Amino acid sequence: MSRSVWKGPFVDGYLLKKAEEARSSEKRAVIKTWSRRSTILPQFVGLNFQVHNGNKFIPVTVTDEMVGHKLGEFAPTRTYYGHGADKKAKRK
């Protein structure tokens, strides 16, 4: 179920403040965040984030296509090793 339109997108307040500071400063500092639930806004395009996945920080550079998605979508929390192979089929 998606968020109702009248509420608008959710973004943590401190994240907006940090993004504003990064935009105004000349150097492109990386914004470290634990806020996976925050929606990516158009003013975040071009900024570099480090999103926590529960274990480490994953670097995410925001592009136009990411607007409207959540930051957590681009920092997977689970490692996929592939399906378990059948041992009988391997021996032959």
Curated annotation (Swiss-Prot):
Top-level taxon of origin: Bacteria
Coiled coil spans: none
One term under GO cellular component: small ribosomal subunit
One of the protein's GO biological processes: ribosomal small subunit assembly
Database matches in NCBIfam families: rpsS_bact
Family indicated by similarity: Belongs to the universal ribosomal protein uS19 family.
Protein name listed in UniProt: Small ribosomal subunit protein uS19
Record organism: Hyphomonas neptunium (strain ATCC 15444)
Gene from which the chain derives: rpsS
